A protein has these predicted regions:
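Interfacial juxtamembrane loops and adjacent helix segments
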Residues: 43-95, 100-117
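Membrane-interface alpha helices of multi-pass inner-membrane proteins
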Residues: 152, 199-220, 255
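Specific aromatic-rich, kink-prone transmembrane helix
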Residues: 102, 133-136, 154, 158, ...
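Hydrophobic/aromatic-rich transmembrane helices and adjacent perimembrane loops
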Residues: 174-175, 330-332, 344-372
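Signature aromatic-anchored transmembrane alpha helix within multi-pass, membrane-resident enzymes
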Residues: 10-14, 203, 254, 368-394
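Transmembrane-helix motifs of polytopic, lipid-linked glycan transferases
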Residues: 118-143, 181, 185, 315
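Hydrophobic, aromatic-rich transmembrane alpha-helices
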Residues: 132-135, 233-239, 301-324
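Membrane-embedded, lumen/periplasm-facing catalytic core of multi-pass transferases
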Residues: 386-443
């Protein structure tokens, strides 16, 4: 394939994959609560993290107090310094919060659509870099098979989980970029080591160190990812009896961890906090983890639509009489990482394993590359059709929060009642899931208990408690339940 044709095809796939993401961005009308907490944390605010609202606010005043209250550059530098010392979110580093804070300098809109469009441009920049790197990563495997290379590029670019990751205002797109960069460096190093062409010099040491830093500084769960790739590297060096060279790569790991501490003083605070990982492992059995892994991730999230992929892989496996030794080792490493990360994750959600998406999907173009002629064309067409169908169902695009549109309307209905009271009984962070949807011109009174309500006329109350729960049993006759949304029950008090 000519270079000009390759470039045009690369550009076409990039434009299509970006277009799909722009479409789903246009459908995004609400936030996941973690996205709002990203704004609070990067701005080093207290409301919504350590303190709750108290007193009377208009919706606009409440939004301004929580979302981007300090848009100036000097304020941003102060917030970045505070986040460098302690970002208060000990299960994440300050990396993404620093980038997001700089991106928000001068931004003052409180409209949901404006915030989504502005903040997602960071992810689009990361995605373009990721896409370019993905091309070079796939070239390591299919440099002699350009059609298979571009098939892999298209399938990964249209992956529903990858799309969801791009339009999620959190650090996971940056994390995916870091994971792919490390995979590229490790695979390239393995190829060169097998050919005895790898140079153990300062340049490669620094590149490998940076690659490790770029992923572990994105999230503590990525230590598992680094460990799995590192174990293969160690195993291969042991096979070649180059034991002393293991020290070289161990040194890159230590240097990367040291660099993480330089970039974030609170990097080791997770070791002194109540650890979600160890706590989760001790509290759940193997069955408790394995069951959610299968039924939530594979079935509820509609991953059963990947059955055509599995059928093609099984067909090739049997027809070509393949063995496990012929499967790309990076795919096996990705499977091990995904199971381990999902097992130890505090929540059963795909965001913790989405960084392994390109490595997991690598098996599909690999299997198709074993076919010839008409069989290869049919298999390729079936896989592309599967990817298109997957991305067209909104249920497959995680974190879109379509259900919040109706629930948010509960906050703005019954305008004939001038008094709206919000009671916060639980954690301050629950207010992150209600403040962005307040009516700018309506007045809201925030209190901490039912006893603080002093209103003799009919009014509306929202309270963060379990679905359908009444704060005081004897009030059932006076409180009319109107619905549940954003961690809050909504009532009309007669």
């Amino acid at each position: 394939m000519k270079k000009t044709h390759s470039f045009l095809l690369f550009l076409a796939i990039l434009i299509v994959s970006l277009g799909v993401r722009f479409y789903w961005e246009s459908q995004k009308t609400a936030f996941h609560v973690d996205e709002v907490m990203s704004f609070v944390l990067c701005d080093y605010g207290d409301l919504g993290w350590t303190t709750t609202f108290s007193g009377e606010y208009t919706g606009a005043e409440a939004k301004q107090s929580m979302l981007f209250p300090h848009p100036g550059l000097d304020d941003a530098i102060q917030d970045i310094r505070h986040n460098w010392q302690d970002n208060r979110d000990h299960y994440h580093t300050n990396f993404y919060y620093t980038i997001l804070r700089l991106w928000l300098v001068g931004f003052q809109s409180y409209h949901i659509n404006d915030i989504i469009v502005h903040c997602l441009w960071i992810n689009y920049i990361f995605y373009v870099a990721y896409f370019i790197l993905l091309y070079f990563f796939l070239r390591l495997f299919f440099w002699e098979r350009p059609k298979i290379l571009f098939l892999g590029l298209l399938l990964i670019g249209l992956s529903a989980s990858d799309i969801a990751n791009t339009i999620f205002i959190r650090e996971y797109m940056l994390q995916e970029l870091g994971a792919l960069f490390l995979a590229y460096i490790v695979v390239k190093s393995v190829i060169e080591i097998k050919k005895d062409a790898y140079q153990y010099n300062i340049k490669n040491f620094l590149i490998t160190t940076f690659a490790i830093w770029a992923i572990i500084f994105n999230g503590y769960f990525q230590f598992v990812y680094v460990g799995v790739l590192g174990l293969y590297l160690v195993w291969m060096l042991c096979q070649k009896k180059d034991y002393y060279k293991i020290i070289y790569f161990a040194g890159t790991m230590l240097a990367a961890v040291a660099l993480c501490y330089v970039c974030y003083q609170g990097f080791f605070k997770i070791l002194t906090e109540d650890n979600k990982v160890s706590g989760g492992l001790s509290a759940r059995t193997l069955r408790g983890y394995f069951s959610p892994f299968l039924f939530y991730s594979l079935f509820v999230m509609h991953y059963t639509l990947y059955i055509p992929y599995l059928f093609i892989i099984a067909y090739v496996w049997r027809k070509k009489r393949m063995s496990i030794n012929q499967v790309p080792w990076i795919f096996i490493a990705a499977v091990i990482y995904s199971v381990a990360a999902f097992w130890t994750a505090p929540m059963r959600t795909n965001r913790y394993i989405v960084s392994a998406t390109p490595l997991l999907l690598l098996i599909v173009p690999f299997a198709i590359s074993k076919l010839q002629g008409k069989q290869q064309k049919i298999a390729s067409g079936l896989c592309i059709l599967t990817a298109v169908v997957m991305m067209c169902f909104k249920g497959n695009i995680e974190n879109m929060n379509f259900d919040k549109d109706e629930k948010a309307n509960l906050l703005n209905n019954h305008s004939e009642m001038p008094t709206y009271i919000v009671i916060n009984k639980k954690q301050p962070w629950t207010q992150c899931d209600i403040i962005p949807y307040l009516n700018d011109h309506r007045h809201y009174i925030f209190v901490n208990s039912v006893e603080e309500i002093k209103c003799n006329q009919p009014h509306i109350v929202s309270i963060d408690c379990f679905r359908g729960e009444y704060p005081v049993e004897k009030m059932k006759q006076q409180w009319e339940y109107k619905g549940y949304g954003s961690f809050y029950n909504h009532y009309i008090v007669k």
